[in-house]
């Protein structure tokens, strides 16, 4: 076993399916989960990623939360600072899978975040508010945030304080592979530059870089 992220990308290299879905061994898929995802992205020819909502449950399948609230649209400015979907809720089309195979990352924080980044940069991300999976919550429960001004402000500052480690390495590697969109390239570079305290306020004020959870 080479770890979750490396194992996923190794399997991705071996698949030639039209649609690829991620799966965790202890989650429960509800009826129509696969059909719903395919229906949502089947009309797209560009690299496309489906992300579904999820019902959080404990080890005994008692419901903790009926689903996440996403009031903001998915996009590259969001993907730069957080992953909004668990891998087990995702499905990608062949076009995205082929693009990902060209550049297998070594510094990805986690595979599902890298896929969100790539899809948001290269094509389309479809977020489905309706959950089709019971997701077992391990450890501490997720804590929701806020998309208010102050929620965004606190979230960005918290992100910037820890951006020098794995997150910065992920963005540095992503920059090496993907650099064909001038606007998105500027957003990425802005975050990398924010490791310098003097440039952090520029990111804090930039509304095109945003978090779903404060």
What name fits each language-model region?
Residues 108, 114, 136-214:
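C-terminal subregions of glycosyltransferases and related glycan-biosynthesis enzymes
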Residues 1-148:
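Nucleotide-sugar donor-binding/catalytic module of glycosyltransferases
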């Amino acid at each position: 076993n080479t770890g979750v992220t490396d194992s996923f990308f190794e399997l991705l290299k071996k698949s030639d399916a039209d649609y690829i879905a991620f799966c965790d061994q202890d989650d429960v898929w509800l009826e129509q989960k696969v059909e719903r995802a395919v229906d949502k992205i089947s009309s797209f020819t560009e690299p496309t990623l489906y992300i579904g909502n999820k019902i959080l449950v404990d080890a005994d399948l008692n419901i903790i939360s009926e689903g996440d609230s996403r009031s903001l649209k998915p996009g590259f400015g969001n993907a730069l600072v957080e992953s909004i979907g668990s891998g087990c809720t995702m499905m990608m089309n062949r076009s995205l899978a082929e693009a990902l195979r060209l550049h297998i990352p070594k510094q990805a924080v986690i595979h599902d975040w890298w896929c969100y980044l790539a899809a948001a940069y290269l094509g389309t991300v479809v977020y489905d508010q309706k959950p089709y999976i019971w997701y077992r919550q391990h450890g501490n429960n997720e804590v929701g945030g806020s998309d208010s001004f102050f929620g965004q402000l606190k979230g960005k500052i918290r992100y910037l304080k820890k951006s020098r480690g794995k997150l910065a390495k992920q963005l540095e590697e992503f920059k090496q592979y993907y650099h064909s969109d001038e606007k998105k390239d500027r957003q990425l570079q802005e975050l990398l530059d924010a490791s310098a305290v003097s440039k952090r306020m520029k990111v804090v004020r930039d509304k095109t870089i945003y978090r779903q959870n404060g």
